[in-house]
């Protein structure tokens, strides 16, 4: 690929057998550190799921090593150019699952999964009337961007999705089901679970939103907003033809695509808000979080009790 920026961000996953995840994680961390990569990689007996960043040379060496390991034969790397690292540190952690569904009877995507649709086929399928589009991501990811007409499951974590489906099964009955997520890993299991639950026509976006946005034919069309990513970039563009902002400021409801974490560490909720409202509301999602003695915004900006009281008074006066 033609390179114009000095760094790359790699997004990848693979369901494959890793006999000793703890040992692999320790060795892989040492290898990543030797290359001076930064990122977050999860390892389980069922495979690997990672995002990491580095220079073009560093990421080339990493991909070469992964491709030379027979366990990762056929692994696909989604590559974004970047001006610098997308992470502060390098973590490689062993986990019981790559994506946390916590099913009593786990899904093996090698044995059961939904039909793979390439971006063009997914685009065409979304336009059909007898189709329902399920976003397999969390609520805050959906709020920043999603496919037109997609259903937003009211969930805060992936493991809540099966229960949500069971409670809302009438939405799916008799429909062709399309599922999508950021890079595809969640849908490998989720679509397989849907098939096992008895839904007959289940498809998934192959390669996820990231691949859809880079596809030269569809160019991200039918996507509104941006795609939430789990690194310091927070959001990446998808639709190359038009940019429709769907995110709404937590405080005013105005169009917004800027995520911050609530300043109360005991809450830490992700909220969309402008820089102006971050300052006005002390980066807190509620009054309770604003007056928290551990409010990070107050501590970081060394605000006095008088300044906090004045800010609270101003908020109250504006109601």
Swiss-Prot record:
Entry superkingdom: Bacteria
Catalytic activity, reaction form: uridine(34) in tRNA + AH2 + O2 = 5-hydroxyuridine(34) in tRNA + A + H2O
Keyword Lipid biosynthesis assigned: no
Domain named Rhodanese: residues: 127-221
GO-annotated molecular function: oxidoreductase activity, acting on paired donors, with incorporation or reduction of molecular oxygen
Active-site residues from the entry: 181 (cysteine persulfide intermediate)
EC primary class: oxidoreductase
Record-listed E.C. numbers: 1.14.-.-
Keywords associated with the record: Oxidoreductase, tRNA processing
Single Gene Ontology BP annotation: tRNA modification
Keyword set includes tRNA processing: yes
Cross-referenced SUPFAM superfamilies: Rhodanese/Cell cycle control phosphatase
Reported function: Catalyzes oxygen-dependent 5-hydroxyuridine (ho5U) modification at position 34 in tRNAs.
Protein family (similarity comment): Belongs to the TrhO family.
Record's protein name: tRNA uridine(34) hydroxylase
Organism of provenance: Bacillus thuringiensis (strain Al Hakam)
């Amino acid at each position: 690929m033609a390179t114009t920026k000095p760094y790359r961000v790699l997004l990848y996953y693979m369901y494959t057998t890793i006999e000793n995840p703890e040992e692999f994680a320790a060795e892989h961390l040492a290898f990543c550190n030797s290359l001076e990569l930064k990122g977050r990689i999860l390892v389980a007996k069922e495979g690997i799921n990672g995002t990491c960043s580095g220079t073009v040379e560093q990421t080339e060496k990493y991909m070469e090593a992964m491709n030379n390991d027979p366990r990762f034969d056929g692994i696909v790397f989604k590559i974004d150019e970047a001006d610098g690292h997308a992470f502060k540190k390098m973590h490689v952690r062993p986990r019981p699952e790559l994506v946390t569904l916590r099913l009593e009877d786990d899904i093996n995507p090698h044995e059961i999964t939904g039909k793979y649709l390439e971006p063009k086929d997914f685009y065409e399928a979304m336009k059909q009337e007898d189709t329902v589009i399920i976003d397999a991501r969390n609520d805050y990811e959906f709020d920043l961007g999603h496919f037109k007409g997609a259903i937003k499951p009211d969930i805060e974590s992936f493991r809540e999705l099966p229960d949500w489906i069971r409670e809302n099964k009438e939405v799916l009955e008799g429909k062709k089901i399309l599922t999508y997520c950021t890079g595809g890993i969640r849908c490998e299991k989720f679509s397989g679970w849907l098939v096992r639950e008895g839904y007959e026509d289940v498809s998934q976006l192959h390669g996820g939103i990231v691949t859809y946005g880079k596809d030269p034919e569809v160019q991200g069309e039918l996507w509104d907003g941006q795609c939430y990513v789990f690194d310091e970039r927070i959001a990446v563009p998808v639709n190359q033809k038009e940019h429709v902002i769907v995110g709404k400021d937590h405080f005013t409801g105005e169009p917004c695509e800027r995520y911050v974490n609530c300043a109360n560490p005991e809450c830490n909720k992700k909220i969309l808000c402008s820089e102006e409202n971050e300052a006005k509301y002390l980066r807190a999602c509620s009054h309770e979080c604003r007056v928290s003695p551990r409010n990070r915004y107050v501590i970081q900006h060394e605000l006095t009790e008088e300044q906090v009281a004045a800010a609270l008074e101003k908020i109250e006066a504006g109601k």
